[in-house]
């Protein structure tokens, strides 16, 4: 039995943080779904930029689009959306078997809209209609403007993956927006089963940023905390999830068919080679969560993973570690704000490079 399938038996979904025409056409994604238990896909402009640069399967379509379509963003969509639809179709049986709890594929709104609430709502609605698949998640950044857009999209019954979250406070703001959006949807008499959302908490980037601050402090005490911020934060974010979605405000919505907003662990490939390659996988296995893995991390889990449920263990230790960061002067909320801003800029840079590649 493949080790990776043990993870799903423990209540966590494994998604692939990659999508390309190669994966679809050579059967690799279908094989991961069948053999590894992969049950969803995430994508972003950086992933599509790499796919376009490395796959031969886009050349004919790109040549045709350069002749027929003057708008570069529409060329991009004409290349990407067929892949998104094909991945959605591949995962549709799983989506249906899970009654809509799993089997999703993510597609991002244009990064230039990260600080534009109405623009994000309009773009998300357009992409939702354009892809026309029930198991699409439209990715919206977790900026304050993006969170406001997410609340509106939830009210409209559009599935959303809120991305670029780097702190417990940012995750909690997203949970609260989801509950408010569902409340408005319930008040209108709409079907609450038609709204699905996840909250993507980015991990390795947090440790990279916090480790740099700890190194700057330079004490033995600070250096002993390197590589611990992200996992501690994730464990406490999960406690916030439980408090929100086991609490009275959500219980009434759940009785009408509303689904809780699962946390999704993102940025789970280690960036520091000194750290264990499953640092952001094994300690965070737990029910009602998702981990989206790059190919290399999925291969590591398959090869030597030891999945046991650890997410609800050592919570007091995680809380003590976060208190220690504060005592040392490491402001995790300030780090999160910087990382979110940098993440938006990184995706915008990748998106513009992708458009230049297509143009």
From Swiss-Prot:
CDD domains: Transaldolase_like. Pathway: Carbohydrate degradation; pentose phosphate pathway; D-glyceraldehyde 3-phosphate and beta-D-fructose 6-phosphate from D-ribose 5-phosphate and D-xylulose 5-phosphate (non-oxidative stage): step 2/3. The keyword Cytoplasm applies. It catalyses: D-sedoheptulose 7-phosphate + D-glyceraldehyde 3-phosphate = D-erythrose 4-phosphate + beta-D-fructose 6-phosphate. Transaldolase is important for the balance of metabolites in the pentose-phosphate pathway. One of its GO terms (cellular component) is cytoplasm. Disulfide bonds: none annotated. Its EC number is 2.2.1.2. Belongs to the transaldolase family. Type 2 subfamily. It is found in: Cytoplasm. Keywords: Cytoplasm, Pentose shunt, Schiff base, Transferase. It comes from the Bacteria. It is an enzyme of class 2 (transferase). GO terms for biological process: carbohydrate metabolic process; pentose-phosphate shunt. It holds the Pfam family TAL_FSA. This is Transaldolase. GO terms for molecular function: transaldolase activity. The active site is at residue 139.
